Amino acid sequence: MTKYEEITLKPLSSAIGAEIGNVDISEELPEKVVGEIRQALLEYLVVFFRDQDLSDPQHHRRFTKYFGDLFIHPNFNLGQSNPEMVYLTRKPGDTAAAGERWHADTTMMKNPPMGAILYALEVPYWGCLLYTSDAADE
C-alpha cells in the first residue's frame, strides 16, 4: 500500500473505494497533492471527497483538468452553458429521472475518458450509487 503524505486516505472496502481527506478540491492544488490523488485513484479505483464545494463551475473544471481533457458527453447535450458538465436535477413532483436504472456513464465509448466526476448536492434517503469493476484480484 502506498504511503500518502499530503492527503488522508480511508479505504472503504477490501476491493474498491477510498475516502480522501485533508484536501479542498475547490482550491488550486500543488502537484504533489494531485499526484497523491492520482495514485489513490489508481490504487482504489473510486475515490470520494466529502464536504466539498464545487458549485463554481470554474473550480469544478480546474479540478477535473488535473486528470486530463474534459469530456463532452454525446448523450447529454442539454443546451446548457457548460457543455462539459451534465446537470441532472429532480424537483418535487418529477416522475422521471436520468440514471434510475443500471447504466454505464462513459465506458461504452470507443475511447472513454479516464474517469468521471460526480458532484452530488443532495442525495435522497433511498438514493444509492454502485460502482463496479472487473479489475479486482481473484
Language model: regions and residue ranges:
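Conserved small/polar residues in nucleotide/adenosyl-binding loops
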Residues: Y131-E138
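Non-heme Fe(II)-dependent double-stranded beta-helix
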Residues: T2-L129
